[in-house]
Regions:
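Glycine-rich beta-strand-centered segment in the early N-terminal region that forms part
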Residues: 24-38, 53-102, 141-143
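Hydrophobic/small residue at the entry helix of a nucleotide-binding pocket
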Residues: 157, 180, 188
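N-terminal glycine-rich cofactor-binding segment
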Residues: 6-25, 42-74, 91, 111-123
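C-terminal hydrophobic helical "lid"/dimerization subdomain
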Residues: 1-4, 190, 235, 242, ...
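Conserved Rossmann-like nucleotide-cofactor binding loop
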Residues: 41, 180, 204
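NAD(P)H dinucleotide-binding glycine-rich loop of Rossmann-like/cofactor-binding domains
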Residues: 96-175
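Adenosine-nucleotide cofactor-binding segment
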Residues: 174-177, 189-259
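Glycine-rich phosphate-binding loop and adjacent beta-alpha segment
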Residues: 210-213, 254-318, 354-359
Length: 359
């Protein structure tokens, strides 16, 4: 039996590097991909720390990792090589959907309620090889760096969130400037947002936001707000004379959710991607801040299959640069260090090389 190495969750909060995992064989309709690079996600941090919110979702023993790119290594039965050529440089949508539920029948595959996710319920990409459905494969441009190819999954979340409602020439608040918030900032800036307010409470996040605005030469189009200061909502409402056109809520924190709603102008849009830790969130002054303003709320989950992927790759091909979001590159053996540093906010994005760093 041919073996490979990979990061396996053995029990909630317990993981280890294994060098004796069976090399996966693609089933009918699947392909096997030799992983070039894979990215550590916030979800991986929650899984590896034993976060109770993941109970009932994860299915150990399972190989972790759902952000990746690589090259097709083997085709399963029934896969047309003309459509999915051997050796192709690809990523993949890791949500394996049912295709028969009401959401899937409406074409909203990303909202499938019986989704299985590779790297969470099914074996994923923190390994030398991974198998996925051929229909989920996304071809990548040959000139796309693997560091970027490895973070397309979260970038897709940011693209889906940011483009949920028109952004060009609009004022935008991004509440929560972690990795996804930073990606939303890149997208909003690239598509022509009039002014962007970056809101956070963490010193490292705020410093990254200021550095990004300076490096991009956006000093007059970006305002960084420390939400620990008095009245962050008033700061935004005053600067915009009534509130932003669009708020993107990425933090998932109850205060962040309320701030996003309160700092949005009448008839504006609030897009929610952040996941609260608690089941229930209280909306303060619900009538005043929400109903009487006639706000529209959008809930975002994952990436639209496959419209978001097409939008994202189009933005990159047109010049949107996200490679600087990757702050650390490591071998698979250093996964524990990578997940710790990412979880502590010391890195904006960590990329792993299961088969060694490509030359």
């Amino acid at each position: 039996m041919t073996l490979m190495k990979g990061i396996q969750l053995t029990a909630p909060g317990q993981f280890r590097l294994r060098r004796d995992l069976p090399l996966p064989e693609p089933k009918k309709g699947e392909v096997r991909i030799r992983v070039a690079a894979s990215g550590i996600c916030g979800t991986d941090v929650h899984i590896c720390s034993g976060d109770p919110s993941m109970n009932g979702i994860i299915a150990p023993p399972v190989v972790l990792g759902h952000e990746f790119c690589g090259h097709i290594d083997k085709l399963g039965d029934g896969v047309d090589e003309k459509k999915v050529p051997l050796g192709s440089y690809v990523s993949a949508e890791m949500h394996e959907v049912c295709y028969v539920c009401p959401a899937c029948r409406d074409g909203a595959f990303h909202a499938c309620q019986t989704t299985k996710i590779r790297g969470i319920n099914l074996d994923g990409a923190f390994a030398e090889f991974v198998c996925v459905s051929a229909s989920n494969v996304v071809p990548l441009p040959a000139n796309l760096p693997v560091q970027v190819g490895a973070i397309l999954d979260p970038l897709g979340n940011a693209v889906h969130t940011t483009l949920k409602t028109p952004i060009k020439d609009r004022t935008v608040a991004i509440v929560g400037y972690g990795p996804i918030g930073a990606m939303c900032g890149e997208v909003a800036s690239f598509v022509g947002a009039k002014h962007i307010f970056l809101v956070d409470v963490a010193d490292r996040a705020l410093e990254r936001a200021r550095t990004w605005a300076k490096v991009r030469g956006l000093g007059d189009k970006v305002t960084v707000i420390d939400a620990r200061t008095p009245n962050p909502v008033d700061q935004v409402v005053s600067a915009t004379k009534g509130g932003v056109d669009v708020s993107l809520e990425i933090s998932g924190h109850p205060i962040g959710i309320n701030n996003a709603i309160a700092m949005t102008r009448a008839a504006g849009n609030v897009v929610h991607l952040g996941l609260p830790k608690a089941d229930n969130v209280t909306i303060e002054r619900f009538s005043k801040n929400f109903i009487f303003k006639g706000l529209t709320l959008h809930a975002v989950i994952g990436r639209e299959m496959f419209r978001t992927w097409e939008q994202m790759l189009d933005l990159i091909q047109k010049g949107m640069d996200v490679h600087e979001l990757v702050s650390a590159e490591m071998g698979l053996d250093d996964f524990g260090t990578g997940v710790d540093r990412f979880g502590q906010g010391l890195e904006s994005k960590v990329v792993l090389y299961p088969n060694g760093k490509p030359r």
